[in-house]
Amino acid sequence: MNREPHSRPLYQAADLRRIEQLAADQPLMERAGLAAADLAACLSGNPGQAVLILAGPGNNGGDAFVAARHLRQRGFAVHLVFAGDAGRLPKDAAVAYQRFIDDGGQPIHEVPSAPSWGLIIDGLFGIGLQRPIAGVHGALVRAANALADRAGCPLLALDCPSGLDADRGHCRGTTIRASHTLTFIAGKPGLFTGDGPDYCGAVTVAPLALDAEQWVRPTA
């Protein structure tokens, strides 16, 4: 993983979606979730700590399901809040959801009380949202921000903090304020411009075994 992403080419969200389509035969979601679990384990510290994971209704939620499965296997006390409908998940996310269930995971639908969270993971929307976050999802974003502040724990966003425009770097209303962001395949301009630096924290790129420049020309 690259911890100096600003020194590498940046890609618009549409370009990243194109790369994902071209590389659809590769296990990108599994790679993303494993990379997330690796970074989460480093941030959280000792196994056994309580980890709160917010999983949304799309592929960002799928990445969260994979990360949750790997963290459970490493001994972390994973509490996964699923804010979606399992019957309407995209194909790869549905597979990740079922593997989490088959491994003994139990999704919940409300944030539980915990003595102390060791880490919170935002897997609600990433770069996939084109509108302000509202309703139950907005409530989860506000809860995650408040809990991270209260516990003084890291808040890790997957790909892009939910609510932040990955291309332009402005917030669409309620937005995750991450201490760390693990972005996949390549960096996005909005992580480093506008509101991005204040909401992304430390940005790390997980290339997922892809060289983005071989697929699409970078934006910058």
Language-model regions, residue ranges each:
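YjeF_N-associated NAD(P)HX repair module
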Residues: 2-17, 23, 117-220
